[in-house]
């Protein structure tokens, strides 16, 4: 009799184990990755609305952060996440909020804008360029200028002199741009080799050389670069994470000498799963997947370009289309 009473329990336990094992073995999906331990104060910020963070993005970002804290790699009280499936340029000067700053110790959450990799159009060969609003193409190839989703840890910050620019009729300013190096793992492990990091979305255009021997930045002949300041927060990057200059100062300061984690969504598995679902005519919710609905409608389906496939194409393209000799920077006229 005792054996009979135990058997149903054993079968019940075994069935539960089978379910758990099946879930653990299945591909990562939005449905499986429900974050049950999201703090109550953070829950109102979770969702698909503007300024909110998708649940799967938050869950992975939190998991990465606490893993690195346990490993002793990170001691920063804050961590970062990016949802690169959301729109960047909303039009009419408005930018989408898809870079997230989360500090659980002081219960703060902030969403700001951030650019994505522009990709490239290799005329007559292949096209993996992205528009300003939504990213369709992702990848980890060197010189691809694409965003690669996955895990990163912030590294050292380097600040470099870019030149001078005019702020008023009688006043010039110096552009010193900081760059935070990211170190990746797995598919993003070549982040340092790709020079992937974070920086302000600003540069100097129409640069010429102006005589200014008293400048601490003057070259050996007494010249300094001078150009027009261009801010491109609503534009695209070479694969890096770019912020508006006003946001960048605060974000970079948070990272200085205090490494932390950055999780960028989507990864290649997510992209492949979404593409398969689109081909099958499945909705994202029905397939247990996540992609911003507005951008998915615009791009049709996303694509991941792995480095082992794309780098040989890029290398051949560079051999067939060598860059012209670099011209010397012209001397400024009357500036």
Report each predicted region and the residues it spans.
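Bacterial N-terminal signal peptides
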Residues: 12-25
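Sec/Tat signal peptide C-region and signal peptidase I cleavage site
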Residues: 27-31
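Cell wall/extracellular polymer interaction/catalysis modules
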Residues: 32-238, 246-335
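N-terminal secretory signal peptides that target proteins for export/translocation
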Residues: 1-11
């Amino acid at each position: 009799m005792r054996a009979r009473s135990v058997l149903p329990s054993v079968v019940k336990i075994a069935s539960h184990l089978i379910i758990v094992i099946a879930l653990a073995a299945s591909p990562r999906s939005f449905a499986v990755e429900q974050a049950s331990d999201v703090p109550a104060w953070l829950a109102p910020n979770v969702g698909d609305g503007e300024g909110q963070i998708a649940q799967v993005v938050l869950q992975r970002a939190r998991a990465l952060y606490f893993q690195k804290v346990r490993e002793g790699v990170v001691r920063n009280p804050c961590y970062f996440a990016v949802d690169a499936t959301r729109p960047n340029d909303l039009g009419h000067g408005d930018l989408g909020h898809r870079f997230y700053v989360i500090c659980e110790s002081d219960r703060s959450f902030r969403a700001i804008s951030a650019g994505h990799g522009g990709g490239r159009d290799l005329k007559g060969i292949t096209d993996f360029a992205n528009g300003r609003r939504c990213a369709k193409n992702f990848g980890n190839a060197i010189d691809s200028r694409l965003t690669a989703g996955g895990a990163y840890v912030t590294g050292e910050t380097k600040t470099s002199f870019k030149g001078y620019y005019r702020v008023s009729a009688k006043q010039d300013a110096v552009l010193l741009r900081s760059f935070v190096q990211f170190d990746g793992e797995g598919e993003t492990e070549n982040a340092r080799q790709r020079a992937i990091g974070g920086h302000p979305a600003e540069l100097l255009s129409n640069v010429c050389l102006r005589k200014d021997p008293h400048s601490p930045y003057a070259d050996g002949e007494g010249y300094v670069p001078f150009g027009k300041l261009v801010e491109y927060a609503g534009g695209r990057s070479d694969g890096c994470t770019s912020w508006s200059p006003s946001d960048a100062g605060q974000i970079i300061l948070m990272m200085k000498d205090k490494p932390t984690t950055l999780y960028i969504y989507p990864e290649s598995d997510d992209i492949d799963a979404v593409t398969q679902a689109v081909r099958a005519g499945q909705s994202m919710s029905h397939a247990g997947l996540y992609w911003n609905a507005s951008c998915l409608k615009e791009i049709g389906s996303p694509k991941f370009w792995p480095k082992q496939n794309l780098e040989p194409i890029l290398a051949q393209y560079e051999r067939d289309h060598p860059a012209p000799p670099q011209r010397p920077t012209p001397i400024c006229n009357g500036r």
